[in-house]
Amino acid sequence: MPFISETASAIKRRFGFNDRPAPSESLRSVPCTPEANTVSRDNHTHQSLLFSSAVRSMPELDEDGAICAGSAQISRSQSFEFNEDPAFWKDHNVQVIIRTRPLSSSEISVQGNNKCVRQDNGQAITWIGNPESRFTFDLVADENVSQEQMFKVAGVPMVENVVAGYNSCMFAYGQTGSGKTHTMLGDIEGGTRRHSVNCGMTPRVFEYLFSRIQKEKEVRKEEKLHFTCRCSFLEIYNEQILDLLDPSSYNLQLREDHKKGIHVENLKEIEVSSARDVIQQLMQGAANRKVAATNMNRASSRSHSVFTCIIESKWVSQGVTHHRFARLNLVDLAGSERQKSSGAEGERLKEATNINKSLSTLGLVIMNLVSVSNGKSVHVPYRDSKLTFLLQDSLGGNSKTIIIANISPSSSCSLETLSTLKFAQRAKLIKNNAIVNEDASGDVIAMRLQIQQLKKEVTRLRGMGGVDNQDMDTISMGCPASPMSLKWDGFNGSFTPLTTHKRMSKVKDYEVALVGAFRREREKDVALQALTAENEASMKLEKKREDEIRGLKMMLKLRDSAIKSLQGVTSGKIPVEAHLQKEKGDLMKEIEVLRAQVDRNQEVTKFATENLRLKEEIRRLKSQGEEGERDILNQQIQALQAKLLEALDWKLMHESDSSMVKEDGNISNMFCSNQNQESKKLSSIQDENEFLRMQAIQNRAEMESLQKSLSFSLDEKERLQKLVDNLSNELEGKIRSSGMVGDDDQMEVKTMVQAIACVSQREAEAHETAIKLSKENDDLRQKIKVLIEDNNKLIELYEQVAEENSSRAWGKIETDSSSNNADAQNSAEIALEVEKSAAEEQKKMIGNLENQLTEMHDENEKLMSLYENAMKEKDELKRLLSSPDQKKPIEANSDTEMELCNISSEKSTEDLNSAKLKLELAQEKLSISAKTIGVFSSLEENILDIIKLSKESKETEEKVKEHQSELGSIKTVSDQTNARKEVAEKKLAALRCSLSNFASSAVYFQQREERARAHVNSFSGYLNQKNEELDVIRSHKREIDAAMGKIQQSEAELKSNIVMLKIKVDEENKRHEEEGVLCTIDNILRTGKATDLLKSQEEKTKLQSEMKLSREKLASVRKEVDDMTKKSLKLEKEIKTMETEIEKSSKTRTESEMELENTIQEKQTIQEMEEQGMSEIQNMIIEIHQLVFESDLRKEEAMIIREELIAEELRAKDVHTNMIERVENALKTLENQNNSVSGKIEEEVENVLSLVHEASRLLEVSH
């Protein structure tokens, strides 16, 4: 990967943004080193252009180092106040600052001084776009703000928070080239000098931090304040953590536990003591950081860097040791970038993808944190990215965070600037919970005991003050560490047997023993708490396992739903686009579940190792508790028992001394004052004895409690050991059971990842075509809009014509209705309103009539009762009149009674006649009243008819409403069917268009297939040719190897012959020497042996000549062997080269075959999609016909319902007219009677009653 040179000048080019001397004398040059002045600047280096003169309101440098006067002038004219708020951090934990960089000379040359943002004040900024967007933040820094001002506003409060014990974090966010690295690091080499204006936030922060630490040490000398600072520097490159201070480390892992929190394992931490040490570490880490050149930034950061400093402080105050610690994170994020703008390719594109992924995860985390701060329960995906996981405490946790959002005012970066402003606006709503990280520890129990003892000592000394005043010869000395005292008696010279030093040592021993016991008990409590915490962790692990099971169940449900949706797609119930979208969502959910399972599996292994470690720790603690601590406790118990015995012995001895003093006092009787002193002395000794006794009892109780706590802790350890063993066994079983599932899930994840990679590759290929077709799409959209408007106008005209035709048809049917449908509807509505008002009036009238009817019914009942009474009286009168006729025979029989009653009978006849006349009058009057009552009955019949007609009118109204609602529902259904028909027509057009595209793509894939086949055939031919050549070479090599074998065999034979000849020659030489010696001794006797010697000499010469020939042959054979070996080596090399070529060609052939298979598969998929499209077109055509049929059916139903509605309206009108006639008749009858009928009937009935009473009275008189 091409990186920029890591020399000092390169670091300056990267982070320095050094100020350069301007040619104009009006502006004062910034002092800097010669090295910084000699560094050359490039016009495309955005960072160097960004903050090249922080002192001069950040004006622009061009290629020659000249200041861009226009930009400087504009920036000066638009400057605002930039000051800190001292009370901000009291109520807030997150601060968001916007920083704008100046325009570069290249941007000014292209677009002038136009900007995409406008600063309104020190807290508000407006994005100039369509539409304008105004944003409000804590602070807004324009291009006039220098590094020093930025540090005073953001860096100084952060250092104060760190010194106060708060975790703090500062990170810069923005697109690439917006000035993040300059803001955070700046000129690092310049930071080593005190007056460098271009050094960034990090060196300034640490310079101020160490000066602040030095001031704290000077102010708090008495408290023995001690600071330690440890620094680490890491980067996150392609989602891998690298240690910038140790380049050999690679792919470090993030860990989380309850002690250290979130930390990087095996990360190098260096202790620093000054700002120079920190700058040195920064320079070392910056030299190892990944940077590369893009179109937008020559020195673009390709990774996120996190510089962490842990500050710890300790001091002692009033016997209590305070420990305060804080973590400071300074983060330089890599900038988000577009492939189109940055021109990233290859490795740069991969880096940009990982950067954008982590930044998008950061944005998602901030969005979910905002939702959480608003009270919603949303999962915050910290673990989706290593950056967010590392900054978990800084985002929504225990930290005070400063976010510096760097933006570019260039119009070409307006969309990126808007995205950064929206990100900062969301981040402003995060709520952190920052607390002071401080711990205080000390011997609180020992201090309490000492305070009690000192109080007792003070009270005792106050009580002894009177004795000291009475006798100056007695000196009393109080010991601060013990309630006992050392007294010197001037007369008898007696003193306590235990000296002050011994008492103090005893008390200290007691205190140390007690403190040790309490500390051990506290450690036991801490150990028990840790074990309970581990138990809770194991329970959480079990819950996570249950969550995994739920996730698997959810995956099964998703699979079932996917199968159902596929069945629906095959059956044609569900469209393909909806199915694909749903399948994509299900796959994303499944991937999330699988990711969570993978994370949980890692956690399971981590917890398993943690459990093993805890087992070992518990075993070790148990062995220590069983072996070492018991011995220590036994020793302490024995020491306490010895001290208790010593105190009791001293008490007994002191009591004997006091008895001896008493005897001496009784014998002498000379020192009265000594007796008083002795009594005081005895009282003090008794107090001391009482104190010792209480202390012994307390020690014994403490020993018993310690023994109990020891036994309880051992039992608890055994119980927890068993619990941990059980949990570990369960965990191992679950891990084994989940092993197969995890493997299957991993395979599924791999396949899904491969599928996603294929899809992303296709999207990348389609991206190029999409860019080309975007303009054509815009033109087509405009044309479609025009066509849609024309279509809407035609539809409106068609609807108007249809309404006019329908109104005309209804005009022929209805005689009274108007010509068009709209007027008919209006008249119908008016008629309905009139009918409603008439119905309300009718209801009122009916109510009044009903009230009158009830009154008439009451009166009628009264009259009927009177009539019945009158009829009863009439019957009685008739019966009375008939009774004298029946009594006449009886009276005639009695002569005496007839004589007496002749006169009375005459009178009675007269009375009877008058009574008959009155009764006849009453009967006539009753007949008249019966006629009047008949009028009431007719009126009642009219009212009943009116009620029936009102019910009928209500029923007709309800029917009319039902028909109207049916008509409205049919209209809505028809509208829906029309809309569905339009959608179906659009889909049909889209399908036809897509089918045409599929046809063109099928042709394209056919061509690709032909090319791939030709490629495969060419490679296969080439491969066959190479294989044939390789076979020829191998056969040639085999022949050479066979020849070499023969030659080697002949060489071996020659070697063996030479050896044999050498042996023979040696034998002949030996024999010749022996025979030569014998010939010199006796030449005469052994003449035959001389001839033999000559023969042997000849044989020797023959052998030597043969040996020479064989050696020559051997030399020639060796030459041939060497030639053969060279040829074989050459052939082997050729074979190897041929094999490598064959392997390469075979790989390329396999790749081409794979490409061919992919093209064939894609072609098949396109054909399948084309077939599906044809089937869908057929289905759409059928659906359109069905919709047309339904719309026609709905129109006919609407026509029928309208006819029924008209008939019901006519019927309602008839009923209404009949009801009105009946009501008018009833009213007329009531008016004619003029409400006097009831009065007349009452008068007539009263007259009848009076007549009946008179008749009855006459009858009584006649009797």
Swiss-Prot record:
SMART domains given in the database record: KISc
GO BP, sorted A to Z: microtubule-based movement; spindle assembly
Annotated region described as Disordered, given as residue ranges: 21-44
Superkingdom of the source species: Eukaryota
Molecular-function annotations in GO: ATP binding; microtubule binding; microtubule motor activity
InterPro entries: KIF15/KIN-12, Kinesin_motor_CS, Kinesin_motor_dom, Kinesin_motor_dom_sf, P-loop_NTPase
Positions in coiled-coil regions: 679-737, 764-805, 831-881, 905-966, 1091-1168, 1193-1251
Signal sequence annotation: none
Record keyword Lipoprotein present: no
Domain annotation Kinesin motor: ranges: 93-430
Binding site residues for ATP: 174-181
Biased composition, class Polar residues, residue ranges: 35-44
One matching Pfam family: Kinesin
Keywords: ATP-binding, Coiled coil, Microtubule, Motor protein, Nucleotide-binding
A cellular-component GO term for this protein: nuclear envelope lumen
Recorded family membership: Belongs to the TRAFAC class myosin-kinesin ATPase superfamily. Kinesin family. KIN-12 subfamily.
Protein name from the UniProt record: Kinesin-like protein KIN-12E
